[in-house]
């Protein structure tokens, strides 16, 4: 919530309101018993949970609105829990009719992260900061830090009193230069994007996630072939949930994005990760379980579809690391897996507070390496869903 407040404040400052939507995130399931999900919501919302979670168990079109064109700053906060199938179908007509529960997390949406980043870079430049592009080759600690950088013009030494390790998938390697082992790893995640010329998905649909585990609807012949391939046979078995779909862009845009973080293999990173050639068809079939109209694209995705991927850097519990990095003057701001844009502003604010020795919020230690000393917190985190998207 803090990070989204800061993002919305940036949008107000820049006047860039047309490039933000706050339709929220919709979590769907075919289950009626959602006690575990509600418990996780209460844990995340804390003392305000009773006022921020609203239940809709009977159809009443006046009590709940999925979307509207009203200003993003006037959008509701909290979470709406829908457990009436007529109400669900009225507001989400593209969803499969077997969906029994919807959790509509209101405070979320879509923003042009590149434009926000450009604004931040220009702000830093106008305040006298200089950006140096290069690769960190070594870090030496004496009474200060000396970084050896490989730049386009050659090697360059930079001496500083404090450093922030915000190297994303390279954060562990940067830490190792200081003989520090961070509890992070990298997994490859892939997505596809394509123009929805068949209008399978309503353009005002929120970012929608199918929470349920599923088996892909291969034909019997396809399944038989898949089972004979040791590298692909897992695709004929039950796969984890959290396949997601969202309309991309505003105005006349027709593009959709689909993603599915079913791979949990810890990998050594490369600058150009090797993508799985079957992923586009796999994620399409997975997403079609929630939005059946996507089946119209089976075996015939538009020729200009885009298949891309990158590294999710994360901890086992999928909470970020923000704060001191063991040695005095060294800090880390990393491990954001799939929620980097959402968390960026609050993460930067929190890291800056650590670096400048300012007053810290109550949650500061929970997002730092200090949390591993809190056995009660870690026990709770290890029980809840990691929520990888």
Where are these regions (language model features)?
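Short Gly/Ser/Thr- and Asp/Glu-enriched loop/turn motifs at secondary-structure junctions
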Residues: 20-25, 187-189, 305-307
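Active-site lid/adjacent beta-loop-alpha segment flanking the redox-cofactor pocket in flavoenzymes
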Residues: 196-327
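Short beta-strand to alpha-helix junction loop
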Residues: 31-34, 103-122, 272-281, 338, ...
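A non-catalytic, amphipathic alpha-helix used as a structural packing/dimerization or gating element
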Residues: 2-9, 43, 119, 278-289
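Dinucleotide-binding Rossmann-like beta1-alpha1 core, especially the glycine-rich loop
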Residues: 1-87, 91, 240-243
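Glycine-rich beta-alpha-beta "Rossmann" dinucleotide-binding loop(s) and their flanking helix/strand
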Residues: 173-191, 358
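Flavin (FAD/FMN) cofactor-binding core of flavoprotein oxidoreductases
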Residues: 74-89, 265-266, 273-342, 349-355, ...
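Helical element adjacent to the flavin cofactor pocket in flavoenzyme catalytic cores
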Residues: 96, 102-162, 166-170
């Amino acid at each position: 919530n803090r990070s989204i407040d800061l993002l919305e404040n940036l949008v107000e400052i820049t006047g860039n309101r047309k490039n933000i939507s706050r339709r929220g995130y919709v979590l769907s399931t075919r289950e009626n018993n959602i006690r575990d999900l509600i418990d996780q919501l209460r844990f995340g919302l804390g003392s305000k949970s009773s006022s921020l979670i609203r239940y809709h168990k009977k159809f009443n079109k006046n009590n709940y609105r999925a979307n509207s064109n009203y200003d993003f700053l006037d959008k509701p906060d909290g979470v709406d829990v829908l457990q009436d199938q007529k109400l669900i179908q009225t507001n989400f007509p593209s969803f499969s009719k077997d969906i029994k529960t919807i959790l509509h997390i209101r405070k979320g949406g879509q923003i042009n992260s590149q434009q926000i980043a450009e604004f931040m870079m220009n702000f830093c430049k106008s305040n006298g900061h200089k950006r140096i592009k290069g690769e960190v080759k070594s870090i030496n600690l004496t009474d200060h830090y000396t970084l050896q950088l490989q730049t386009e013009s050659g090697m360059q030494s930079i001496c500083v009193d404090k450093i922030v390790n915000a190297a994303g998938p390279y954060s562990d390697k940067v830490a190792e230069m200081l003989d520090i082992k961070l509890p992070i790893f990298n997994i490859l995640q892939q997505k596809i994007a394509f123009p929805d010329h068949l209008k399978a998905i309503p353009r005002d649909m929120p970012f929608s996630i199918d929470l349920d585990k599923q088996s892909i609807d291969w034909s019997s012949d396809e399944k038989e072939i898949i089972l004979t391939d040791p590298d692909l046979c897992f695709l004929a078995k039950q796969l984890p949930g959290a396949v997601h779909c969202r309309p991309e862009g505003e105005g006349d845009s027709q593009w959709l994005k689909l993603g599915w973080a079913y791979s949990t293999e810890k990998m050594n990173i490369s600058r150009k990760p090797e993508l799985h050639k079957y992923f586009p068809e796999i994620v399409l079939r997975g997403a079609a379980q929630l939005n059946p109209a996507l089946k119209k694209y089976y075996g015939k995705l538009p020729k200009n579809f885009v298949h891309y991927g990158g590294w999710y850097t994360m901890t086992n519990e999928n909470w970020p690391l923000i704060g001191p990095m063991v040695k005095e003057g060294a800090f880390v701001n990393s491990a954001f897996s799939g929620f980097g844009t959402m968390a960026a502003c609050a993460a930067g604010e929190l890291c800056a507070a650590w670096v400048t020795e300012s007053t810290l919020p109550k949650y500061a230690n929970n997002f730092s390496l200090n949390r591993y000393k809190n056995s009660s917190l870690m026990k709770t985190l290890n029980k809840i869903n990691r929520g990888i998207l």
